[in-house]
């Protein structure tokens, strides 16, 4: 029997990396994060497991071009999310080796903000994360980004929220036209104000996914495009 396991490769920007005394402290922090992501994924009731394959911690010296070249100096230094996700997707499309090749999803965790660039060279910080719709398993589209300002719950929510975009769900209240997968049911029947993770997140429902999100993810799982997340069950 097959098990559904979504494998993640995490890369961190220099601003996030330097918050930690050591690489092992950073890796422990990210590992704890995935316990939280698993708990949220469990609310889909689709038997989806998450697995962290590895972490690459970039420093100012080793940051790849997609990070360095797109940093808006500010102050504070920040990114335009659309520009960054596009550059990151292209970068990993052209660098399919090692964990980047083997993984189902690649996430950048950044300690810098994201938002809309203003004319004066600063950025209106308004975006916690961004990801490619239904991009799981597709080498050129399996990227996502989560900002981390060190509030544990917010961080886990963002990672789970962006993961589910990659697994084929739009925001609650959005139709199938916003999913990059033909035939998707979309989520127009679940209003954002119901407060789920893909909606406006109220106290009652902010730690679970809506019935529409479940249907969208279930639909993606039924398609050949999701083949990489099915694997033989471990004992």
Curated annotation (Swiss-Prot):
- InterPro entries per the record? MetalloPept_cat_dom_sf, Peptidase_M12B
One of the record's GO cellular component terms: extracellular region
Q: Where in the cell is it found?
A: Secreted
Alphabetical list of PROSITE patterns matching this protein = ADAM_MEPRO
Q: Where is the Peptidase M12B domain?
A: 4-233
Q: What class of enzyme is it?
A: hydrolase
Primary location class: secreted
Give the cofactor note text: Binds 1 zinc ion per subunit.
Q: List the disulfide bonds.
A: 137-228
Q: What is this protein called?
A: Venom metalloproteinase antarease-like TserMP_B
Q: Which organism is it from?
A: Tityus serrulatus
**Lineage of producing organism:** Eukaryota, Metazoa, Ecdysozoa, Arthropoda, Chelicerata
